[in-house]
Amino acid sequence: MKITAIELSIFELPTNTARFDLEEVAYGRRTRWQSRGHGRIDAPIHVLHVLTDAGIEGICTVGDARYQTMRREELEQLRIMAVGHDPFDRERLDAKLRFATRSMFSRPGWHGAFDNCLWDIAGQAAGLPVCQLLGRID
């Protein structure tokens, strides 16, 4: 099996976090800070898709608490370095992308969603949920 394409979908969704200001309010003999809302915001949600020649598509949202998007430069570099490779060779691809991180001036872990997509592909190919591929503690 080979990776044939890597795509990115971008959605604008309302976030759970609203913008706010803090104001001091009297609270007995003391004061305390109270938030005053400034409305909800929409945020981009990036979803990475890794397609294979076997028709299996690995899907994962991008990011964590530190970042929620994939830059165009990272997506293009990922395509150059991963398309045409075996999606089951996760360790080799991870080592290659970790080594490339310094030359790209990208944050460590920028390719984490790609790794999750590879696990999704492996799970679909095996007919198992990813949690069973990873194992569990009894």
Question: Which residues does each predicted region cover?
Answer:
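Structured beta-strand/loop patches that form or line metal/cofactor-binding pockets in enzymes
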Residues: 1-59, 63
